[in-house]
A protein has these predicted regions:
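The feature marks proteins involved in alpha-glucan
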Residues: 3-22, 58-136, 141-152
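Glycan-recognition and catalytic regions of carbohydrate-active enzymes
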Residues: 416-421, 476-493, 503-572
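C-terminal beta-strand-rich structural cap/linker in extracellular carbohydrate-active enzymes
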Residues: 31, 73-77, 606-626
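Short proline/glycine-enriched turn/loop motifs at strand-loop junctions of beta-rich domains
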Residues: 31-36, 579-580, 589-591
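Substrate-binding/active-site clefts of carbohydrate-active enzymes
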Residues: 138-306, 316-332, 336-339, 347-348, ...
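Structural beta-strand segments of beta-rich domains
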Residues: 23-27
């Protein structure tokens, strides 16, 4: 691994924590300042006393080792580290690849036996960033209310024909799964009880979450079913992106980090207190050589073992730039990396060295979410009741224009008028994620209801479709929240991380209730996929071919000219009209064919006319070409 070699590190320092063969199992735990380490072997994943305890021996670089003879498959293990005269408590270690129920004990399994049929020929799909269209989904939300689901709320739901057909019909090319590693907040022993969590509370970073498996008591099941899910999606041409949360752990004192290497993996402030840049009680120290190497090995493990196509990095702004660049270097080029270019609080590390959105220009091949585009379309994150462009409020054009070009430098974007960022922060347009809503904050329907008092269903649909037109015609990487294609709401809940299924589940009945919404999303995605002008992928090409038109308030208009990106259409005009009245936009006189108009999409053409003025109906988008 070039990135690790450059730092003088050992490629398998963490990844080789447990090595199983039928003849014996080798254990190797990093515990650099330990006085002693005991290895406990258990017959079960929970309860009972150890069937064997082995005193591990200290080797080089603070790695403690032990070898236990015989076939241990099906057994469980923990480590117990002694440091400064104190036993730190049992832990499955730092890099468990399989665990018992609730992740308290590591499990010894034959990883090769978890590979589903055809796994050896499965690969990450290798899509270019320009071909990625992201669908963000929570494992439980997506399937728990689907009547014909055989495995509601489980990894295997995404192998079922109805699920695959929905995603393929919509046209998305990648599914982004909210945290699916082993997290702490759901009790896997009592899944009969109502429980819900998004999963941003890491326990074991390198094991799939047990509550999404059909049997969390059998360690190999969650591993195999995650792989089955990945393979089914790959077979359908859908890439798999995992949401990863390395910026904090569920807590400090009971974490696997703290029970092996106290205070090594966490930052402290000048007062010696644990820093909380995550807003969750702690923040990890990615700049520390051990945490840096841990992250690199963990990313690479998921990419290699589970054939993942990409990663969404939670609170990426907590991590340092150097570590993010090393992760980028360690992974294949077409494994997508994007993240939140901010933190949730002040970090105990210089801000100029953090992977913030403003520093994305220093991280080639890594993207960040554009809150400029999001908030200029729907309103600020800080106030759910404030509206913006969708309510035809003035002053938001430049921010939307920045989002349209992918937050790159463009001669027609005045960044002094852009919200949050006063200069371009992306070198290439594919370093910007274009979106209007995600799992965080109000979903788009709820935001429209909160920010535009008295809004009716027809107007809500018009504005919903208008907002997504900006997203899917952006030169950035388009990103949508699952269920928005069926007009999803969350009953106005702003932060639904522990809300019940009644709030978070997808409203599948809406597919029949609002078929025009799905058809429009489907059409926009098909338009983007069919026409390279909307995904040029190069800042130089965007500056050459994308030209904004002079228009009044409540409007954004641009032209993709001269067969941009080799497109079959010579010039494409996109007009977004948030006003409550129709507007006219001047264009060169020519014969134009409309493909998006008045809430409908037809790539073969809706209407053709020769004109020098485009009439754009109220609260809608118009796309024409010549």
């Amino acid at each position: 691994m070039a990135a690790i070699a450059a730092l003088g590190m050992n490629a398998g320092l963490f990844n080789n924590e447990v090595t199983y063969t039928k003849r014996g199992t080798t254990f190797a735990l990093v515990a650099q300042k330990a006085q002693s380490v005991n290895l406990n072997i258990y017959a079960e994943g929970t309860g009972g006393k150890p069937v064997k305890t082995v005193a591990m021996r200290k080797g080089e670089k603070g790695v403690w080792k032990a070898e236990v003879k015989g076939d241990l498959k099906g057994r469980f293990y923990t480590f117990n580290v002694k440091q400064d005269g104190k036993m730190l408590g049992e832990t499955p270690g730092l890099f468990a690849k399989a665990v018992g129920v609730n992740g308290k004990r590591g499990a010894i399994i034959d990883m090769a036996a978890t590979n589903p049929e055809g796994w050896e020929s499965d690969r990450a799909l290798g899509y270019a960033p320009t071909d990625i269209i992201v669908y963000e989904s929570h494992n439980r939300d997506f399937s728990v209310s689907r009547k014909e689901a055989r495995y509601p709320g489980k990894f295997l739901a995404l192998t079922e024909p109805w699920a695959i057909e929905h995603l393929k019909s919509l046209g998305v090319t990648a599914i982004h799964l909210l945290p699916s590693f082993d997290y702490a907040s759901v009790d896997e022993e009592h899944l009969d009880r109502p429980q819900f969590n998004w999963g941003y509370d890491p326990l074991n970073y390198n094991v799939p979450e047990g509550s999404y498996s059909t049997n969390p008591f059998k360690p190999e099941v969650r591993v195999k079913e995650f792989k089955q899910m990945v393979k089914a999606l790959h077979d359908a041409g859908i890439a798999v992106i995992l949401d990863v949360v390395y910026n904090h752990t569920m807590d400090i004192h009971n974490s696997n980090f703290q029970r092996t290497n106290p205070d090594v993996f966490y930052r402290k402030n000048d007062k010696g207190e644990y820093s909380d840049g995550s807003g969750c009680g702690n923040e990890t120290a990615s700049e520390h050589p051990l945490m840096r190497q841990y992250m690199i090995e963990s990313f690479k493990y998921w990419a290699d073992e589970y054939h993942l196509d990409g990663f969404r990095v939670d609170l990426m702004g907590v991590h340092d730039i150097a570590t993010m660049n090393l992760i980028r270097e360690a992974l294949p080029k077409n494994v997508l990396i994007y993240g939140e270019g901010w933190s949730a609080g002040s970090c105990a590390y210089p801000v100029e060295k953090l992977a913030m959105k403003a520093n994305v220009y220093q991280m080639p091949g890594i993207a960040a979410f554009s809150d400029e585009m999001r908030d200029s379309i729907r309103g600020p994150f800080s106030d759910d009741h404030q509206s913006a462009f969708l309510a035809a409020k003035p002053g938001h054009q430049e921010s939307i224009k920045a989002g349209i070009v992918g937050c790159i430098e463009h001669p027609q974007v005045d960044y002094s008028k852009v919200n949050y960022s006063k200069k371009p922060w992306a070198i290439e347009p594919t370093q910007m994620m274009a979106y209007v809503s995600c799992h965080d904050d109000l979903c788009l329907v709820d935001r429209l209801k909160a920010s535009i008092p008295g809004i009716g269903t027809d107007e809500l649909i018009r504005l919903d479709l208008l907002a997504q037109t900006a997203v899917f015609t952006s030169q950035g990487v388009p990103f949508m929240l699952s269920g928005e294609e069926m007009l999803r709401d969350k009953k106005g809940v702003h932060n639904s991380y522990i809300s019940p299924d009644s709030i978070n589940q997808l409203p599948w009945d809406n597919m029949q209730k609002y078929p025009q919404v799905f058809a429009y999303y489907q059409g926009l995605i098909a338009l983007r996929k069919a026409h390279p002008a909307f995904r040029l992928g190069s800042a130089e090409l965007v500056r050459k071919h994308l030209e904004f038109l002079p228009v009044g308030e409540g409007l954004v208009a641009f032209r993709l000219k001269d067969n941009a990106g080799g497109d079959a259409w010579r010039d494409i005009y996109v007009v977004l009209n948030a006003n409550k009245y129709a507007c006219m936009v001047d264009v060169p006189e020519d014969a134009y064919t409309s493909v998006v108009a008045a809430g409908k999409v037809n790539l073969d053409g809706i209407r053709s006319t020769t004109t020098s003025k485009l009439e754009v109906p109220a609260q809608s988008a118009l796309i024409v070409h010549n």
